[in-house]
Amino acid sequence: MSTIDDLPPLRDVIKRHALSARKSLGQNFLLDLNLTARIARAAGPLEDATVIEIGPGPGGLTRALLAMGAQRVIAIERDARALGALEEISGRYPGRLTIVNADATQFDSRPLLGTTRAKIVANLPYNIATALLIDWLSVEPWPPWYDTMVLMFQREVAERIVARENEEAYGRLAVLSNWRAETKILFDISPAAFVPQPKITSSVVRLVPRDKPETCERRLLEQVAAAAFGQRRKMLRQSLKSLPADPARLTAAAGIEPTQRAETVPISGFAAMARELADIRNRTNRA
């Protein structure tokens, strides 16, 4: 039996450390240890793994990760009130929990990893979740310093991450996410599982980095997607006019029609337009 069962219930931990959730920090604490264990299992085998966790709060997911054998958990927590609760967990798992009191949006965890590839597993604070994901998907060089991400988002955001062309939620976030990773919504979590209860359903998403995403420059891919989806109701021949290239030339290079709209273009099409944009730029620079 894991020593996690010897630790006090999370509700008692929250009360003892006065951990009332703060809206300004995007906090909603997940107290059901069955659910935290399910999230931890979704990351795959944890034995010998190093895990980055963002916003552990009272430590429910932290406990699950350690109980399932994670060799090391690096918990990045901005709220100093939670540090005492995390130190209690550290005492039960000596040498396996590294606690960092920092803002995850400003902290680079890579120096703590050395040459080890990590897993990122987190119930992300809602107010920084998308920004963190974009940062992780934008790292260079690629493949990245992590091999799996299992993350919780608002259901609406999760749908935007995994969407494919011709789906309502398909947009810039889906293009970047699915260009660089295989994405899947694993399961939903009811608002009733959290304290305090949010007004929306949450979803756990797994992202596995692709070793070789379709060849193109990330910044140009994002530039093309931003132009196309910035006027998503318009045809590409109109929405792509903000780019330094003839829209017809870009769509021809991708084998798509200039009368199509952004939501109908697969990621391969966006990558092809990004490559053509790079070729045009390079030829212009040589001229």
From Swiss-Prot:
Pfam families: RrnaAD. SMART domains: rADc. PROSITE patterns: RRNA_A_DIMETH, SAM_RNA_A_N6_MT. Its EC number is 2.1.1.182. One of its GO terms (molecular function) is 16S rRNA (adenine(1518)-N(6)/adenine(1519)-N(6))-dimethyltransferase activity. Keywords: Cytoplasm, Methyltransferase, RNA-binding, rRNA processing, S-adenosyl-L-methionine, Transferase. Gene3D superfamilies: Ribosomal RNA adenine dimethylase-like, domain 2, Vaccinia Virus protein VP39. This is Ribosomal RNA small subunit methyltransferase A. It comes from Nitrobacter hamburgensis (strain DSM 10229 / NCIMB 13809 / X14). The gene is rsmA.
